[in-house]
A protein has these predicted regions:
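Active-site acidic/histidine clusters and adjacent loop/turn architecture
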Residues: 35-104, 169-186, 191-192, 196
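Catalytic cores and adjacent binding grooves of peptidoglycan-active enzymes
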Residues: 23-25, 137-244
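Acidic/His-rich structured neighborhood in mature extracellular/periplasmic domains
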Residues: 96, 109-160
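Sec-dependent N-terminal signal peptides
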Residues: 3-13
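Bacterial Sec-dependent signal peptides at the C-terminal "C-region" and cleavage site
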Residues: 13-22
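Acidic helix-start/capping segments at beta-turn-to-alpha-helix junctions
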Residues: 99-118, 191, 196-206
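Envelope-exposed proteins and targeting segments
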Residues: 98-100, 123-127, 233-237
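Soluble periplasmic/extracytoplasmic beta-strand elements of cell-envelope proteins
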Residues: 103, 126-132, 196, 238-240
Length: 244
């Protein structure tokens, strides 16, 4: 937990040191957008849908934070209330198995609908999660701070960063997270409908101890993607959820 605590201290210091990223502004935005207590309703599909009474994810927690203030203040961090609840529970449960810090990326608009440039994310049941990284086999966070530009980072087919091969994807951490998301979702009567990750990275994912468990669970990880979509899912993994 020492790494997580230090990360939060640095995060809060940086927020307080700049106007747009100030903790006060984040807190005010969150407060202003959490007054709707009506139940969430997801309509349609992730690629053609809408969302009633979407709930805003807290910008940061004890071991995670949202990845970009511009995205957050633009209303792109809303979810169906059940998805929000089990996503936060999974982060809480991760504290028992890892001292890593995690980043959540784009979710849905408050009322769903098209979320450019994503093809999905339309009804509050889709989330992008930032790939956790290591450098020289230790947790590495420097690339977590670049905001929306993170979507354009490039990793090779073995999960190594194109600009520095000592930086690589932590596949064990990803598998641990997905397993705990699945467990928390099941408890709420939901399941993971689809996990999207660059196809060439699947072998690396399944080779880890938790990855073997993930494969045994039968959680669907995409079998094929278009060339463009495949190339865009090396810096993050996308998950669609659905009610059982």
């Amino acid at each position: 937990m020492k790494i997580v605590t230090l990360f939060l201290i640095v995060f809060c210091f940086n927020c307080c040191s700049s106007g747009q990223d100030s903790v006060d502004k984040i807190r005010k935005y969150y407060t202003d957008h959490t007054i709707d207590n009506l139940p969430s309703i997801s309509h349609g599909s992730v690629s053609n849908g809408s969302l009633d009474h979407g709930k805003l994810i807290p910008y940061y927690g004890s071991n995670y934070s949202y990845f970009d203030t511009t995205s957050y203040f633009s209303g792109r961090a809303f979810l169906h209330e059940d998805v929000l609840a089990f996503t936060l529970k999974a982060y809480k449960n991760l504290e028992n198995v890892s001292n890593r810090f995690y980043r959540i990326m784009e979710c849905s608009n408050q009322m769903g609908g098209k979320l450019w440039p994503h093809q999905t994310h339309q009804n509050g049941t889709s989330i992008d999660f930032m790939m956790p990284l290591t450098k020289d086999h230790k947790p590495y966070y420097n690339l977590d701070e670049i905001g929306l530009s993170h979507y354009w980072l490039s990793f090779d087919d073995n999960g190594k960063y194109s600009e520095d091969k000592s930086v690589e994807i932590d596949f064990e951490a990803i598998a641990q997270h997905i397993l705990l998301l699945n467990e928390a979702a099941n408890e709420k009567g939901w399941k993971l409908k689809k996990v999207i990750i660059k196809i060439e990275l699947k072998d690396e994912l399944y080779a880890t101890p938790s990855g073997k468990k993930l494969k045994a669970k039968g959680i669907y990880v995409v079998q094929g993607l278009s060339k463009m979509v495949n190339a865009l899912h090396d810096d993050h993994y996308h998950i669609d959820f659905t009610k059982v």
